Structures are given as structure tokens and as C-alpha cells.
């Protein structure tokens, strides 16, 4: 067996679109940029393309490293590359930074052509369906009429699912990992707490903080801390941190004492240093609004009737943010419609973030699934 390798040094590309993009919120984006990366080679038949959809804080940088920043490794580098589950010797892999993002695609930090200033909070609300429409236009630009597969975890899984409903004829296979057909009330509640942390930060300035030369770092830090708790499992937090005290004994202060406090503050500070608060607000609302069954009276069976792809649905036993029960809802609806679907529930202790990790059972499953896809 070939030893897995990195795709090596990569470089992002930018596609500009002049054609207005109608949005589900009622607005229109007159023109926009999408930043993307590709790995592997598109075959002569243009039949080996795989789209990887990112989650809330992800980006187009799925695999490889940048020449000027070799420590910036793609967020799914353990999965994508020669000899890896998503093998770039076989597939042409595409990663896209979605609209509203903060990694180069048009978003709140971009200039609003109507005002000459950053969009800020005036950037229109975007939905998963809008993202998929924009991705489809990029596929057209690249000459890809049909994807061999579309894959994503968490919010990325929602995009993969939406692709099979919006463009069923353009998707051969879909992998929906650690995802759900819609958010629960509890999930929406977590997102709202995170948003309020940002919205009430004095440096938020109604979303126009760019013009003030500040960022709502305190709010974004707290939002990330709240979110990060939900990405981990109780068992994994207990095993990694337990009740360990940084100083060996209690010092009775509001400063950092427990190791888990130190970890959360570190993650929050790091996130606030590179992510955009408006993008966070926008993307959590995108999550909240996703509900393909809504226009079918809440009937998921009816909503998924349009799908024709072969599916892989994956959940993780300790994921309480998007529990296995939510994945099974998708599976049951697909089976009701007599679609080809494989389901796996992976026993992994890491919680929701398991879909990002190098779990042997998980990767073996994905390798076998991708191996069976004919291009």
C-alpha cells in the first residue's frame, strides 16, 4: 500500500462573477468573488471532481500548505491527498470559501459597491441554498457538469445534502457527515448565545467596526468558547483536562485555575485573532435557517424525494451537537424514498469534532466508500 502523502504546496484561486445572484432572503448580490483551491487533476471526461464543503469556521484551504506559511495546513489534510481516503491520484478535489466568508470570498469585510465602504452588518443574509447556487456557478466555470461526489461535515454536510435536492442531476454520490436535516431548538439557542456575545461587545459598533479600526474580540472570543464546548464530548474533556488545576491547588480567584479554563481561553483568543465577527454572525444564522423540509410541511420524506445520489451518512457516538439520531432521520427519509444509502455510526470519544480527526475506523470507512466510486 502506498504511504499517504501531502498534496504539497498549494495556492488559492479567485473566480469573479458579474451575473447577479438572487438570494433566498429576497436580496441580490450584484457581483461577487469565490476563492477556491483544487487538488489533483481533472480527467479528460471531467467525471472525477469531488466538492468538499466546509463547516462554520472552515475555508477553501482543505489540504496542503502555503509556500509563505508552511504551518497553515489544510483543515482536512489528513483526509485529502495521495494515498489518503480522498485520493487525489483518482479525484480532482475542490474546496470553496463560501459567500459571507472571511478568507477572500465576498463577505462582510468586502467593499459594498453602493457605498464604497465595507459591507459590515449590511451584507445580505445568505442560506445554504445560496451557497450551493454559487458553488454550482463555480462548477460551470470549471467545466464540471456533474460531481462524482460532494462531501462535507457538520454545516458542510448540510451543503452536500442541499446539493442533492437543488441539483440532483449533478451529484453522483454524497457524504453527509456529523450533520443534521435542521438544527434543534437547543442548537439554535447555543448559536444565539454566541451571537449575543458579539452583538453586545462595545467594539461591535453595529457591525461596522472596520471603520473604527477595532474588532469585537471579546465577544468573538466568548462565542468561540461557547461553541467549542459543544464540539467536544464530556468524556474527551474529562480525559484531556479533568479537574486539573494549573497551580496544583486552588488559589480562590477568578483568574484561570482549571486547565479547561486555560484551554477555552486559548482557543477563544486564537479564533478572535483570525476570524471575522460578522462572518460568524452570518454563518450561524445560515445554520439556523437550514430546513429543507420546511416547505414540505415539515415532512423530510417529501423533502428528500428529489435526491437521486448514492449516499453515505456518518455519525459519531459522542457527538451531542449533531447526534446520531439526527443522522438517522436523514437515513430513514432516504430509505423511505428507496435511495441507496449506507450508514455508519463511529465509536469515537471526541464528540462533534470527530469528523475532523484521524480516526482509523472513520478513515477506513471513507477509503472504502471512495474506492467504490467509478470515475
Curated annotation (Swiss-Prot):
Q: Which GO terms describe its molecular function?
A: homoserine O-acetyltransferase activity; homoserine O-succinyltransferase activity
Q: Which domain of life is it from?
A: Bacteria
Task: Please state the pathway this protein functions in, per its UniProt record.
Answer: Amino-acid biosynthesis; L-methionine biosynthesis via de novo pathway; O-succinyl-L-homoserine from L-homoserine: step 1/1
Compartments where found: Cytoplasm
Listed A to Z, the keywords are: Acyltransferase, Amino-acid biosynthesis, Cytoplasm, Methionine biosynthesis, Transferase
Q: Does the keyword Signal apply?
A: no
Q: Name one Pfam family in it.
A: Abhydrolase_1
Q: What is its EC number?
A: 2.3.1.46
User: Which InterPro entries does this UniProt record tie to the protein?
Assistant: AB_hydrolase_1, AB_hydrolase_fold, HAT_MetX-like
One biological process term from GO is:
methionine biosynthetic process
What residues does the record give for site: Important for acyl-CoA specificity?
321
Please give the chief subcellular localization of this protein.
cytoplasm
Q: Provide one Gene Ontology cellular component.
A: cytoplasm
The UniProt entry's sequence similarity note says: Belongs to the AB hydrolase superfamily. MetX family.
Note the subunit structure. Homodimer.
Q: What does this protein do?
A: Transfers a succinyl group from succinyl-CoA to L-homoserine, forming succinyl-L-homoserine.
HAMAP family in UniProt: MetX_acyltransf
Q: Quote the protein name from its UniProt record.
A: Homoserine O-succinyltransferase
**Which gene name does the record give?**
metXS
Amino acid at each position: 500500500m502506498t504511504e499517504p502523502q501531502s498534496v504539497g504546496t498549494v495556492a488559492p484561486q479567485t473566480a469573479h462573477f458579474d451575473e447577479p445572484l438572487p438570494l433566498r432572503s429576497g436580496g441580490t448580490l450584484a457581483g461577487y468573488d469565490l476563492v477556491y483551491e483544487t487538488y489533483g487533476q481533472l480527467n479528460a471526461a471531467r467525471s472525477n471532481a469531488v466538492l468538499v464543503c466546509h463547516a462554520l469556521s472552515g475555508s477553501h484551504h482543505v489540504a496542503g500548505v502555503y509556500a509563505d506559511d508552511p504551518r497553515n495546513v489544510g483543515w482536512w489534510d489528513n483526509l485529502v491527498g495521495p494515498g489518503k481516503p480522498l485520493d487525489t491520484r483518482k479525484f480532482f478535489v475542490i474546496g470553496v470559501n463560501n459567500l459571507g466568508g472571511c478568507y477572500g470570498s465576498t463577505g462582510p469585510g468586502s467593499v459594498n459597491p453602493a457605498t464604497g465602504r465595507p459591507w459590515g452588518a449590511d451584507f445580505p443574509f445568505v442560506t445554504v441554498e445560496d451557497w450551493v447556487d454559487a458553488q454550482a456557478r463555480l462548477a460551470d466555470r470549471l467545466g464540471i457538469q456533474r460531481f462524482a461526489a460532494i462531501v462535507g461535515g457538520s454545516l458542510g454536510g448540510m451543503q452536500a445534502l442541499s446539493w442533492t435536492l437543488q441539483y440532483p442531476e449533478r451529484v453522483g454520490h454524497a457524504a453527509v457527515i456529523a450533520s443534521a436535516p435542521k438544527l434543534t431548538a437547543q442548537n439554535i439557542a447555543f448559536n444565539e448565545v454566541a451571537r449575543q456575545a458579539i452583538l453586545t461587545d462595545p467594539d461591535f459598533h453595529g457591525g461596522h467596526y472596520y471603520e473604527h479600526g477595532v474588532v469585537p474580540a471579546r465577544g468573538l472570543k466568548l462565542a468561540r468558547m461557547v461553541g467549542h464546548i459543544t464540539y467536544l464530548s464530556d468524556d474527551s474533556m474529562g480525559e484531556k483536562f479533568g479537574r486539573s488545576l494549573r497551580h496544583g491547588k486552588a488559589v480562590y480567584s477568578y483568574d484561570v485555575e482549571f486547565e479547561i479554563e486555560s484551554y477555552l481561553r486559548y482557543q477563544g483568543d486564537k479564533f478572535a485573532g483570525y476570524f471575522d465577527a460578522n462572518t460568524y454572525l452570518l454563518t450561524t444564522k445560515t445554520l439556523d435557517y437550514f430546513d429543507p423540509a420546511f416547505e414540505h410541511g415539515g415532512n423530510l420524506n417529501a423533502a428528500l424525494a428529489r435526491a437521486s445520489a448514492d449516499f453515505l451518512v456518518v455519525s459519531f457516538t459522542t457527538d451531542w451537537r449533531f447526534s446520531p439520531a439526527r443522522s438517522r432521520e436523514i437515513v430513514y427519509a432516504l430509505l423511505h424514498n428507496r435511495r441507496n444509502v449506507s450508514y455508519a455510526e463511529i465509536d469515537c470519544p471526541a464528540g462533534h469534532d470527530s469528523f475532523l480527526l484521524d480516526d482509523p475506523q472513520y478513515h477506513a470507512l471513507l477509503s472504502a466508500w471512495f474506492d467504490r466510486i467509478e470515475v
